[in-house]
């Protein structure tokens, strides 16, 4: 009976030691994964800053801004005239806005 109890005790201790070693190994892997992630993010940020310093990104942004402005200017002009016509219909109800 004592031999059985000693065997169970020994197996329990070995199992706990194994679980502790696995847990420590998992924490180590998790820490290395997190540090690797932050290193990747930092490297990406450095690359992005280097690209932003270059004229290529600035040229692309300027071209995009100009294209957007060209496309939206007529839309906002029409919206402005429509808004003025709408508001003028409240101010002077006798005058009707020109219909198209």
Swiss-Prot record:
The keyword Signal applies. The modification Pyrrolidone carboxylic acid is found at residue 24. GO terms for molecular function: apolipoprotein receptor binding; cholesterol binding; cholesterol transfer activity; enzyme binding; heat shock protein binding; high-density lipoprotein particle binding; high-density lipoprotein particle receptor binding; lipase inhibitor activity. One of its GO terms (cellular component) is chylomicron. InterPro entries: ApoA-II, ApoA-II_sf. Its main location: secreted. It comes from the Eukaryota. Residues 1-18 form the signal peptide. It is found in: Secreted. Keywords: Antibiotic, Antimicrobial, Cleavage on pair of basic residues, HDL, Lipid transport, Pyrrolidone carboxylic acid, Secreted, Signal, Transport. Belongs to the apolipoprotein A2 family. May stabilize HDL (high density lipoprotein) structure by its association with lipids, and affect the HDL metabolism. Has antimicrobial activity. Monomer. Interacts with NAXE and NDRG1. This is Apolipoprotein A-II.
